[in-house]
């Protein structure tokens, strides 16, 4: 009887460890995906004072097809 109780407790502990590990891995995947979306998101327009030809050519908004040019009036 004592062995069955110990086995049941160990089984429950193992199941909890599996559930916690799965949740942590899922959270890591979500964090990576959210970070990727944040990196791909468009930045606000660059102020006219900082607007250079290099920034127009290499800005995030210019390179991504779904974004408008950052420096529209360079």
From Swiss-Prot:
InterPro entries given in the database record: ShKT_dom
The keyword Ribosomal protein belongs to this UniProt entry's keyword annotation: no
Localisation: Secreted; Nematocyst
Domain ShKT: 42-74
Site positions per UniProt: Important residue for binding Kv1.3/KCNA3: 46, 50, 59-60, 62, 66
Keywords tagged on the record: Cleavage on pair of basic residues, Disulfide bond, Ion channel impairing toxin, Nematocyst, Neurotoxin, Potassium channel impairing toxin, Secreted, Signal, Toxin, Voltage-gated potassium channel impairing toxin
Function noted in UniProt: Inhibits voltage-gated potassium channels (Kv) with higher potency for Kv1.1/KCNA1 and Kv1.3/KCNA3.
Family: Belongs to the sea anemone type 1 potassium channel toxin family. Type 1a subfamily.
Protein name per the record: Kappa-stichotoxin-Shd5a
Origin species: Stichodactyla haddoni (Saddle carpet anemone)
């Amino acid at each position: 009887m004592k062995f069955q109780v110990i086995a049941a407790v160990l089984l429950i502990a193992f199941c909890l460890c599996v559930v916690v590990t799965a949740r942590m891995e899922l959270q890591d995947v979500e964090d990576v995906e959210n970070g990727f979306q944040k990196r791909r998101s468009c930045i606000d327009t660059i102020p006219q004072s900082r607007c250079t030809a290099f920034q127009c050519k290499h800005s995030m908004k210019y390179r991504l097809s779904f974004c408008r040019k950052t420096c529209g009036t360079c």
